[in-house]
Regions:
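Generic structural signal for well-ordered alpha-helices
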Residues: 81, 105-112, 153, 179
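Histidine-rich, glycine-flanked metal-binding segment
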Residues: 1-4, 10-53
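Histidine/acidic residue-rich metal-binding segments in metalloenzymes
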Residues: 116, 145-215
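Divalent metal-dependent hydrolysis catalytic cores, especially in the metallo-beta-lactamase
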Residues: 62, 78-107, 120-133, 160-171, ...
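Active-site mouth loops of central-metabolism enzymes
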Residues: 63-75, 139-146, 188-192
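Short amphipathic alpha-helices and their capping/turn segments at secondary-structure boundaries
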Residues: 40-48, 107-119, 199-206
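Divalent metal-coordination and catalytic microenvironments
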Residues: 8, 22, 27, 49, ...
């Protein structure tokens, strides 16, 4: 279905566009212009000068609306995702705190299933841990924190293509090898819950780490 929003203040990469229009087909943006001329065949929505912005992409989210992604169930995933979809989020990376392998696999199975649905808002799974610095655990579960182990993470990565981001503390033994491996598989490596110094971060960058999570 073709839809056109007119008479809107639109946020674009170049700034705000006043009195513009947004043309969409099946909820996908086709065109943004500063012309309010109606497109033949489109359902018109008059924004009456209100703001129109692209949908939010939630890259770090542990749950919502009473649903916790750590539960790993479809019910928990859908509850949390629907809660965020009601408030402007259109894409989401469900996030797990430090978990056991069975917990990761349960969530990965659910995530894979939801990603396969038409027009799914789920873009992939984010693992915040469990290869973190114990001294910087914060709200993480310390009993699940450990050093990177290729005998553990390689089978996980090979089995679950839904994993798109994985966080680690680069000062841990084996963390550089871990970063090189996962980035070679197309997974974003992020520095997190760490006591890394400058040289550690520099080495991490050279080993594929390109993002940061929870520095404190």
């Amino acid at each position: 279905m073709l839809t056109q929003i007119i008479n809107a203040k639109i946020l674009t990469p170049q700034g705000w566009l006043k009195d513009g229009s947004v043309l969409m087909r099946d909820n996908k943006i086709l065109e943004v212009t500063n012309c309010d001329l109606a497109v033949i065949g489109a359902e018109l929505i008059d924004a009456k000068g209100m703001y129109v912005v692209p949908g939010g992409v939630e890259i770090h989210c542990h749950g919502g609306g009473g649903g916790d992604f750590m539960e790993g169930t479809e019910e928990a995933f859908r509850t949390a995702i629907n809660a965020h979809m009601k408030h402007g989020t259109t894409s989401i990376f469900p996030t797990l705190s430090s978990s056991t392998v069975p917990m990761i696999e349960a969530a990965a199975e659910t995530c894979t299933r939801l990603m396969a649905e038409p027009d799914s808002p789920v873009l992939g799974l984010h693992l915040e841990g469990h290869y973190l610095n114990m001294k910087m655990a914060g709200g993480q579960m310390p009993e699940n924190i450990k050093d990177p182990d290729p005998k553990e993470y390689i089978p996980i990565v090979e089995k679950w293509g839904c994993i798109k981001r994985w966080d680690a503390a680069p000062e841990l033994p084996g963390a550089m090898q871990f970063g090189k491996y996962i980035t070679g598989k197309g997974i974003l490596a992020s520095v997190a819950h760490t006591q890394a110094e400058y040289e550690d971060i520099r080495a991490a960058w050279e080993s594929g780490y390109s993002h940061a999570t929870h520095f404190y």
